[in-house]
A protein has these predicted regions:
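Alpha-helical metal-binding/catalytic segments enriched in His/Glu/Asp
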Residues: 92-94, 108-161, 322
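Solvent-exposed loop/turn segments at secondary-structure junctions
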Residues: 12-16, 99-101, 112-116, 155-160, ...
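Metal-dependent peptidase/peptidase-like ectodomains
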Residues: 154-267, 273-277
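Second-shell loop/turn segments in exported
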Residues: 77-83, 113-125, 153-154, 181-182, ...
Length: 337
């Protein structure tokens, strides 16, 4: 059967109130150094990013647009006006049940919330589309998998990974339990790995000294696969990341993949001390996105019309990468018509 066994995880979104920060007086320090590097370069090492990353080169200021009038489109302005409210939330998932090992699964995820008064096209309509397309492909009636695959669309990522953290909290202790006993049913198969997709389209290179980023996808664009060295399962996650790179080497049509050790700020993070966990992105989150390489990140310009076919093709190659890797890991077969 297909991925029709849709379920929901219900949780309570109840963070403490955000502190109202006082703006510090004076001017902010310059984003980029004014003096040359010790070796005479114009710009070099330029601070640290999240996840243990180091930033090199020119940076571009980043942040979340919260001003409604920054979005000229009235429909999008209205769509973005709702602020996160504490209360009950849910997120949807479905499962391709394995034929030989239904009690084991890989989790494939993306977050479906967004902010910044845009359309959330890249962050994270792009990752959401990949998960839905992979669910469609694997759910074809002529596709069998030995192991199970769960496709999850997280909520509340932008507010602090709340939806994925709730999933881990509620379900980690239920892994591999047959319920009811003797039924052959496993509501929460044992986690073999978690793969997150978050911002898949835009790899136009570093900003220049004027803060501008190229309008075009760069010739060196690639799919960035990240694991986190500072996690309990770093070695297993590293192996999973390189397995995905080898799948890209074998099957991607347009763009290669690169592996980095600083996975951060996305829904694979709550999983990383429980199961091997990786993220796929347009750039490394710490040293690239964190340095302002994507000028549409959390901005009103994160719109479908912003991105080109070359941008969308990078997302497609990430989908090819995950499809090829997971198909091998779950022993997928296609029966003859």
């Amino acid at each position: 059967g297909g991925c029709t066994n849709t379920e929901r995880l219900v949780y309570t979104f109840d963070p403490p109130p955000r502190p109202v920060g006082r703006r510090s007086g004076g001017t902010r320090p310059p984003l980029n150094p004014v003096d040359p590097t010790p070796t005479g370069g114009l710009v070099g090492r330029n601070g640290s990013g999240p996840g243990g990353s180091s930033i090199f080169g020119y940076r571009r200021r980043t942040g979340v647009v919260r001003a409604p009038l920054a979005q000229p489109n009235e429909t999008l302005r209205a769509l973005n006006l709702e602020e996160p409210r504490n209360g009950e939330r849910s997120e949807v998932f479905c499962t391709k049940v394995g034929t030989t090992n239904p009690d084991e699964m890989y989790i494939i995820g993306a977050h479906m919330d967004g902010h910044g008064f845009g359309e959330a096209a890249n962050d994270n309509g792009s990752g959401t589309a990949i998960v839905m397309e992979l669910a469609r492909i694997f759910s074809a009636p002529d596709v069998q998998t030995g192991r199970s695959i769960r496709f999850v669309l997280w909520n509340n990522e932008e507010t602090g990974l709340n939806g994925s953290a709730a999933y881990v909290e509620q379900r980690r202790e239920r892994q591999g339990l047959e319920d009811p006993p003797g039924s052959g049913r496993y509501p929460e198969p044992r986690w073999l790995g978690m793969i997150q997709h978050d911002m898949m389209l835009f790899d136009h290179g570093a900003p220049g000294p004027d803060g501008r980023v190229s309008r075009d996808q760069r010739p060196e664009a690639d799919v960035n696969i990240e694991f986190q060295t500072d996690s309990a399962l770093a070695l297993e996650s590293r192996d999973l990341a390189f397995f995905f790179k080898s799948a890209n080497d074998a099957y991607a049509t347009d763009y290669p993949a690169a592996v980095g050790p600083h996975m951060t700020n996305t829904d694979s993070t709550p999983f990383m001390n429980v199961t091997p966990a990786i993220s796929l992105r347009e750039n490394e989150r710490g040293m690239h996105i964190g340095a302002g390489w994507d000028p549409h990140w959390h901005q009103p310009t994160d719109l479908y019309v912003t991105f080109t076919d070359d941008d969308f093709r990078l997302g497609l190659n990430a989908a090819q990468t995950t499809l090829a890797a997971i198909a091998q890991l779950v022993d997928a077969t296609v029966s003859a018509p």
